[in-house]
C-alpha cells in the first residue's frame, strides 16, 4: 500500500483571522494526503476543527482530527499541534473486550531523559490501517523552538540539542515501544526543525545545521536514524533580508530548509520512500508570494510518500 503523509507549519493557525481556510483545504485535498501533521496550532485547535468541519468534510471526505494542548510559555511562544487523517485509510488503535479503550495521541513530556528538554514537547500518534496489512504507523510531530533571535549562538545550540534528543532518545523509544498485538511498527518524525540539512551549496549565515544521520546500537544490532527533505520550505521576508538565516538567491522566494522527516531504514523498512516540498504557491496561489504568507503561512508543506 502507498500512503502520503504531509507536514505543514500553518503559522499561528487559529490565532490569525485572515487565514484562507478554503485554500488550505484545497491544498490538503488536492495533494491527496492521507495524514497531515500541523504545527503552530492555537486556541486548542479551534481553527483546525473549523477547517475540518466546514471546508473538508463537506467535500465528501471523511476525516478525523486530534489537537494537543498548547505548550511553551505564556509570552507568545505557547502553541499546539494537530493531526488530521482520512478515516477511510486509518483509525486509532482500540483495546478492551468491546474495543472501548482507545489510544489517544499524546504530548511526549514524560519519557525518561526528555523531561524539560523540549520547549514544546513533541506530539505522538499511533494509526492502524483500516484495510489490509498488520502494521501500525507511529508519527511524531515536532516544532523545535527557534529561540531568541538576539542570541543566535545559544538559540542555535538549543535547537541542535532538541534535535539531538529527538533522534537519540524520543525516536528510538517510540519506535521500540511494545504493544500487546505486536504489529510491525513504522515510525516517522516530522515537522519544523528550524535547522537545515548541511549541504556545501547551502550558505547559512547562522550555521543552523543538523546532523543528517545518527547511529545507535541495541545489543548487537546497529541502526541509523536519517533526516530527509533538502528543499527550501520557508518564505523570504518581503524585503528578502529580514531575519532569515539562509542566503536567498536573487531569483528565489525561499529562505530556509527547515521542514523535514526522520526515520530509521532498519526498523521502519518501507518498500519505497521519498519526500519533497510541495510548490503550493505556484500550484494553488498562482505564484503570488504576497498573498500566500499573508493568508496561508510562511512555510510550504512537505510530504513523505511511503510504500508498505
Map each language-model feature to its residues.
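Short, solvent-exposed aromatic-acidic interface loops
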Residues: 98-105, 143-147, 276-285
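Extracytoplasmic low-complexity repetitive segments enriched in small/polar residues
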Residues: 13-22, 29, 39, 44, ...
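N-terminal, active-site-proximal structural segment of metallo-dependent hydrolase catalytic domains
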Residues: 1-81, 113, 164, 256, ...
Amino acid at each position: 500500500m502507498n500512503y502520503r503523509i504531509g507536514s505543514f507549519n500553518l503559522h499561528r493557525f487559529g490565532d490569525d483571522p485572515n487565514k484562507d481556510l478554503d485554500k488550505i483545504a484545497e491544498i490538503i485535498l488536492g495533494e491527496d494526503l492521507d495524514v497531515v501533521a500541523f504545527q503552530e496550532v492555537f486556541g486548542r485547535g479551534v481553527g483546525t476543527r473549523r477547517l475540518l468541519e466546514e471546508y473538508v468534510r463537506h467535500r465528501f471526505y471523511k476525516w478525523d482530527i486530534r489537537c494537543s494542548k498548547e505548550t511553551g510559555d505564556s509570552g507568545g511562544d505557547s502553541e499546539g499541534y494537530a493531526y488530521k487523517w482520512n478515516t477511510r485509510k486509518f483509525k486509532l488503535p482500540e483495546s478492551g473486550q468491546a474495543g472501548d479503550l482507545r489510544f489517544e495521541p499524546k504530548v511526549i513530556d514524560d519519557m525518561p531523559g526528555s523531561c524539560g528538554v523540549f520547549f514544546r514537547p513533541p506530539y505522538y500518534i499511533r494509526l492502524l490501517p483500516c484495510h489490509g496489512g498488520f502494521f501500525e504507523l507511529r508519527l511524531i510531530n515536532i516544532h523545535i523552538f527557534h529561540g531568541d533571535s538576539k542570541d543566535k549562538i545559544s538559540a542555535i545550540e538549543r535547537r541542535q540539542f532538541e534535535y539531538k534528543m529527538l533522534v537519540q532518545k524520543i525516536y528510538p523509544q517510540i519506535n521500540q515501544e511494545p504493544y500487546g498485538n505486536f504489529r510491525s511498527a513504522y515510525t516517522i518524525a516530522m515537522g519544523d526543525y528550524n535547522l537545515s540539512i548541511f549541504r556545501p551549496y547551502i550558505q547559512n549565515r547562522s550555521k543552523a545545521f543538523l546532523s543528517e544521520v545518527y547511529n545507535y546500537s541495541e545489543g548487537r544490532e546497529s541502526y541509523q536514524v536519517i533526516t530527509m527533505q533538502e528543499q527550501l520550505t520557508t518564505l523570504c521576508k518581503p524585503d528578502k533580508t529580514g531575519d532569515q538565516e539562509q542566503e536567498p538567491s536573487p531569483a528565489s522566494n525561499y529562505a530556509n530548509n527547515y521542514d523535514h522527516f526522520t526515520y530509521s531504514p532498519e526498523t521502519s523498512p518501507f518498500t519505497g520512500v521519498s519526500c519533497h516540498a510541495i510548490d503550493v504557491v505556484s500550484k494553488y496561489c498562482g505564484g503570488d508570494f504576497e498573498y500566500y504568507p499573508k493568508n496561508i503561512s510562511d512555510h510550504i508543506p512537505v510530504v513523505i510518500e511511503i510504500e508498505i
